[in-house]
Amino acid sequence: MSLDKNGIAKRVARELKDGYYVNLGIGIPTLVANYVPENIEVILQSENGLLGIGPFPEKGKADPDLINAGKQTVTTIPGSAFFDSSLSFAMIRGGHVDLTVLGAFEVTDKGDISSWKIPGKMVKGMGGAMDLVASAKNIIVATTHTDRHGKPKLKTRCDLPLTGIRCVKKIVSDLAVIDITDKGFKLIERAPGVSVEEILEKTGAPVIVEGDIPEMKL
């Protein structure tokens, strides 16, 4: 059975390491803030000018003045800081972000990503994604394995406008965890109840499969 959005976020949260500074992109990635392991300290950054994001607020306790880059209300942790976007992007471009988690429309087996524009649909711009893919030390994509029409998002070539090339290291989808290696996609884990055959069928590129593939632990 495929994961829902929260399941994807839970699995991404297992990639966080103590001391990391992490930027969470719009969409599924923002949910990761709810699942940061309690035994580590991670500082979450939002490019609109907030360092030290906490979980989403409980119902009825939201502060409308506290929002992330996706305009969602958030909470802050002790020691959090607010600043303008120029300083926020100085942090990003200066290489001070250890990990970025982004959503995507397409990802290739070489690590290319398209995440900001679908021709014919109105968009407000790419936000901070291009700066993030060019500067972050590690990039994970959190996404569904296929689009709403059932077509693979994991491909050999991006057909949509690119955000960055050869930058994505890992994909966590509703079906699988896949590393991007020098030889292409490599299957690491599968979602509970999902077969290797289903993953291969729904991936638009060859996938390396070595030995028994374990189920994800959430």
Language-model features, listed with the residues they occupy:
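N-terminal active-site beta-alpha-beta segment that forms phosphate/nucleotide-binding
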Residues: 1-77
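Conserved phosphate- and dinucleotide-binding cores of soluble alpha/beta proteins
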Residues: 3-7, 58-218
